[in-house]
């Protein structure tokens, strides 16, 4: 499928109990996973995410709905395509999705500048 300038919102996991209509303003919705059975066949799940997200392009968004493990898989797959990942996060105050821009290209391997959650150097 050639989608040119059409943006896509990759929905990690189908959840028919959620109203995702607000996310449509960021692009056409496309589900990555349905409701797979656990335990997951991890190799096939990664392959499926890569297949579904193979047309990821700069400007697309990832909507983190569903199992956190599958969300992590989709984040990694998206980062294989582009250093910059746009994520939609639900804002309970405005009742809308807010875009977040995650630039993984800015990350270095120098961990001396990082601190742990308890403020102790790593």
Enumerate the predicted regions with their spans.
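Long, low-complexity, Lys/Arg-enriched
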Residues: 1-61, 73-122
């Amino acid at each position: 499928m050639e989608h040119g300038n059409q943006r896509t919102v990759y929905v990690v996991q189908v959840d028919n109990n959620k109203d995702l209509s607000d996310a449509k303003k960021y692009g056409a919705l496309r589900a990555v996973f349905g409701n797979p059975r656990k335990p997951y066949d991890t190799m096939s799940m990664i392959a499926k995410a890569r297949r579904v997200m193979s047309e990821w392009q700069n400007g697309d968004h990832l909507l983190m709905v569903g199992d956190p493990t599958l969300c992590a898989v989709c984040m990694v797959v998206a980062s294989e395509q582009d250093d910059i990942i746009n994520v939609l996060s639900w804002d309970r105050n405005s009742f809308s999705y807010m875009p977040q821009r995650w630039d993984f290209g800015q990350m270095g391997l120098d961990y001396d500048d990082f601190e742990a959650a308890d403020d102790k150097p790593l």
